[in-house]
Amino acid sequence: MLRAAGERLLVLDYDGTLAPFTARREDASLYPGIAPLLAAIQRQGTRIAFVTGRPAADLAARIPLQGVEIFGAHGQEHLAPCGHLTRAALAPSSRQWLDASALRIASAGFEHALERKYGTVAIHWRHEQPDGRVCLEGLARDIARGLPADVQGLAFDGGYEFRVRGRDKGTAVADLAARHPQAIMAYLGDDLTDEDAFTALPPTGLGVLVRATLRDTRAHLWLRPPDELHAFLKSWMTAVKP
């Protein structure tokens, strides 16, 4: 099926999917052996795109591939293969609310747990001690009580984030599917935020959950990284070979 497809599209999350979580987000890197596999798949003619919560430019610096498309900040940013970056419009009131929320988190002594991205403020507690996690969870709940209508609060694996409505991983996948209607598409992700992407896949698309433990999901397939992830990518290569 893959070999006969006129176009193939492999869409990938990064953190927790292709790269293990680390105490410092800036230290995250691909599992060993993943980069050459992706490069080989790309050389075979599969189009590769990334959909991530990270800023698009940050992810571009971590991926040793050329000519890939990146949706960053959960779809708020789009980095074209040519390097052109576009961002969704944000209302001034939304930006001000996010700025105030980020300041509140930092002022509470949790600047180390704060991640500010375009259209998003995230609180990370995966590597916090129990007492610190309790405090961060309480702070997230307090901030969430004052959510404006155009901002949503969302839990993810290891934290909580406040994100301007309108764009998410699902809208990114829907955009790709609309521009490549004949492509056989697979989406690989690990987190709750990836469920939007699984839902947005076309009927012929394959959703792949990549994580150590199974959870309720809309994905069609479950892989435990890194070994089963390697096997899946190698199988993709084999299926495409003439």
Per-region residue spans from a language model:
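Active-site phosphate-binding/coordination module
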Residues: S29-K117
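Substrate-recognition/cap helix-loop segment adjacent to the acidic, metal-dependent catalytic center
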Residues: R54-A73, D131-V151
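Non-catalytic pre-domain segments flanking phosphatase-related domains
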Residues: M1-Y14, L18-T22, E26, G33, ...
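Mg2+-dependent phosphoryl-transfer enzymes with acidic/Ser/Thr/Gly-rich catalytic loops
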Residues: A5, Y31, R165, G170-P242
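Residue-level signal for inorganic ion chemistry
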Residues: G16, I70, I123, V173, ...
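Charged, glycine-interspersed solvent-exposed loop segments at helix/strand-loop junctions
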Residues: A113-Q129, V151-R163
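The start of beta-strands in P-loop NTPase/AAA+ ATPase cores
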Residues: R8-L10, V68, M185
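Substrate-recognition "cap/lid" segment bordering the active-site pocket of phosphatases
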Residues: A73, L79-Q96, L154-Q182
